[in-house]
Amino acid sequence: MDLLRQKLKAKSKRLARYVKCTKKKQQNHLFNTNEKLFYRQLSSAGTNNYHNLPSKDELFDYWSSIWSYPQKHNEGAAWIESEAGKSNIAPMMFDNITTADVNQAIGQINSWKAPGIDNIQNFWYKKFSSLHEVLASKFTHILQHPEDIPAFLTHGLTHMLPKTANTQDPSQYRPITCLPTLYKILTSCITNRIYRHVDQNNILAEEQKGCKRGHQGCKEQLIIDSVILRQAQKQCRNISTAFVDYRKAFDSVPHSWLISVLNIYKINPTIVSFLEASMKQWRTSLQVNINGQYIKTNDISIRRGIFQGDSLSPLWFCLAMNPLFTMLNNTKLGFNLKINKNTNCTVSHLLYMDDIKIFASNQQQIQHLLDVTERFSRDVRMQFGLDKCRTLNIEKGKIINGDLALPNGEIIAAMQNGETYKYLGFQQARLLDQKQSKSKIRNEFSQRVSSILKSELNAGNLNRAINTYAVPVLTYSFGILQWTKTELEDIQRTTRTMMTKYRCHHPTSSVLRTTLPRKEGGRALCDIINLHNKQINKLRDFFVTKSLSSNLHKSVIGADKKYSPLNLADPNMDLEITTDAEKHVKWAQKALHGRHHHDLNQPHIDKIASNRWLADGTLFPETEGFLMAIQDQVINTNNYKKCVIRDPTITTDKCRRCQQTSETIQHITSGCSTIANTDYLRRHNQLCNIVHQKLANKYGLLNTYTPYYKYNPKAVLENADFRLYYDRSIITDRQVTNNRPDIVVVDKKAKSVLLVDVAVPNNNNVLDKYNEKMAKYTDLAIEVGQMWHAEKVEVVPIIVSSTGLIPKSLEDSLKKLDLHKNTFIDLQKAAILNTCHTVRKFLNM
């Protein structure tokens, strides 16, 4: 019975190991091929508790009620005539689509962006460049003859992603439409031309940052907003604000208004005719695919709203909203942003796509501005999402309650004391809520780092995932929230602590190495302090540049007296950036950590090759962290405990095995006589196995491949041209003491002999070991040359240090053996894996 229990335990352990190995391969393959999908699966792990789905008819009926029933805007609105009467807009000219236009459009689209019903990703259009001239010709023809638009070109495929756990409600889905790649390329060509026209004629309002190129988007708006709110608070000024949210803004714009606004801004009639014709053919089918449950609806005609999924839709929507900004600016109302006693700038609104924030000096002004906004919205048949609209009135530093009534009778609720509103990702009331926002960001950052560390990614992919999935949570807040250096250091410390918790980082390993590039001996984690400072400096430069042409930016610079993290009013502020060179200097100065830096920079060491295992990043995170701790010499040896951390319980630093010398990490990795014939020999033999098998395959002595740790070399392999000895004594005429090299290669035709000997010394013995091997087998080389009538006999030392340092001589040795120059990668990996195993085993004794 006990035997069965033991067998069951062994099988269970093997199964768990197999499952973990399979998961590791799958996750790393997914990460390398589709990083976005990996993150999506990571974020949804444990949250896919979706059970009930809406029926196909319910899904169809709900979304067709939004999209399929056309509405017309109020063509008689007075403001439309005023907007159309602008004389400073030059008519847009039409030019044929050129090959250069197609090249530019294809280059702007992600190679592997999900395709539509065509199932052809943009990658193939990029690679088949011979098609570009044909596409340019066809696109030009379609623009000039919209009646020839192929039916498939305007057919979308909409994936419905659940927004909440209530998956039975069809309204609780977010539609993501995938359009045919050809349609996206065509509309990208159109977008580039429309954008040039819009830019040249300065059509888009300065307050709109939703699709403006060369701007900072949400961050720019939030910085301006912060300066306004802080000035109002510091100077105890009255301020009234309103947050306006539209109900399904993109999905509710009438097609009649979309065409009308193109004509108002004098877009070329050929392009307008094409877009008008294509709108009549817009249609999409909805599909839901959750937990194996699949639903696909019939086609839904799009008769209202913008066909989302291409680069034209955001610009088109911004143009549709643009007259509102003219109307608001024409009121001459707003908050007066003071630069000095005699100069101010009136700001009435800020906008990012459909997120509108309105500013005024008092409640009467905010009422008037909201009335203007409501009138515009009513004329273009767009509705406020009143549950997400709020007003805030502050008089003499106090929040004044009082809802606002719109002309149509709807009420916008006023914010109460203690209530906050989420604007462009940050909670705010009278000011941005710094404490709550920081806490939320730090929690989200920690959750993402934790989910990454729980995965089975290899070390390189894991660190890359932290940089690309977790760090951006922080990056968005840089320049908006007031982060102190202490807080940023604490975030970096928290990251290292979490890595230590998951056995990916030794608690006393070098901190400097974590943020250095991998090719320079680091782990390439993002330096958050440097990133923060670079962002601040970049944003400051942006505002200064924009101030040359923008009165708003110029005013914000003058007003920002430590109101935002940028402190724009101070022209001398320049945050320090710690360079990699400075980090190397500090690393080299460390008493323990600096020893590896010294070894790495010796003239006989190939620095790039020595760091190749880090650059590849294919090891387990635990193994990588452990080896770096070995290199940093912070392993709990007796010498470290007695002489470095001064452990009072340690009375001697002698080796626990041989009791001869001090137990340093160098002694354990390559200096203890008691494990020379076991652990060191196994490590040495595995490197020999790699070289022997590669030579045997090269010379046709073997035609199979076996993992080096399972490979068992034969003492003699021979064919008509080559003979290969392994660990075999060479019988000589005169007595030669050192007559047993690891490998002997005899080339019968060339009459040459190579005496190959492998060694895995400590870092400080690499050069001495090479010279020792050359001297050791010189006598044997002479004897072999005379006995075997060889025209050429060479000694070829294969030296790799116990922690993976590669001497420059190894490249020459591999050339002599005619092996691929990257063979050192396998040798290095075998050496460091065995070293890690040896140290772990030794410390457990």
Where are these regions (language model features)?
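Extended C-terminal regions of large enzymes
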Residues: N467, I491, C504-I650, K654, ...
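Surface-exposed loop/turn segments and immediately adjacent short secondary-structure elements
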Residues: M1-S171, T181-I185
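Conserved catalytic palm subdomain of right-hand nucleotidyl-transferase polymerases, strongest
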Residues: S111-I120, T158, D169-C178, K219-N263
